Amino acid sequence: AFYDKLDASQKRLLLKEVQKNGTKFFNRFNNHLENHIADNHVWQMAFRIFTMATFSVYGDLPEAEVWADYCYNLWVARFPGLNQDGAWHNGDSYFHVNIRTLIEVPYFYSRISGYDFFSDPWYEGSAMYVIYQQPPFSKSAGNGSSHQNVLQPNGVRVGYADALARLINNTYSADYVRCILQKESDLLRKAFMAKTGDLSWFRLQNHTPLPEGRKMKDLPLAYVFPQTGVATLMSDWENFSRNAMLTFRSSPYGSTSHAIANQNAFNTFFDGKPLFYSSGHHISFTDEHSVYCHRSTR
């Protein structure tokens, strides 16, 4: 963004640092990341940072040509999600730390290639996941590590819904955003500088208006994400203070890490507040409290 503002010595310094650190990243990722089921921290931000650094020095560093080929093909092969239904395998809390990657990387590729990377059906499913797993003013549906801390849709989540609404012309997401911002008008500002979730830079570049059309009240009262094993049932899309909701999860075989797999687990809510819900925290992925309480296994 400020390339023409840098003097020659500043450019040399930046190229030297990108070359040094980019080489470390590539040597760490190559023949590992593409074969790893879900290297969480890399996907959350390191891969996005490496991708942007790579293209920023393309034409200046010879290594960048190899890096760019790797980054692009890895994205096409493995992302946006590790499934096809649009739900997030690691649950609602860890979903939030992937949001900048899920928007900024495909938006960049779309701009330089002319191909719409958001045409992947996964993003339509992701829009439904955002809405059904945490309706306006509701606590999280309750799956994955740290889900108990996701109390109401925050600025990061609403910012993601805002971006999806504009990028895939999803009117349900647009209604979700309008509904929440009507009561919490400064919510997007609260996400500013969240290193994995702030989409302010995207909003400065994209001026597509929020679409108009069908609203949340037109959605079905139940939705299933079969590959992730998650389902939500509710009673009212118009009066959230009177909405009764039940969420269900039965993890697919092989769930790992922050997914903290569970079987036939359910949570119940009224007015966005949990009635029957998982309790507390987990010390490790397999401690007794994690297995019997945090995973909400019943």
Where are these regions (language model features)?
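Aromatic-lined, polymer-binding surfaces characteristic
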Residues: A1-Q134, K139, S146
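Extended polysaccharide-engagement surfaces of secreted carbohydrate-active enzymes
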Residues: H89, Y94-R298
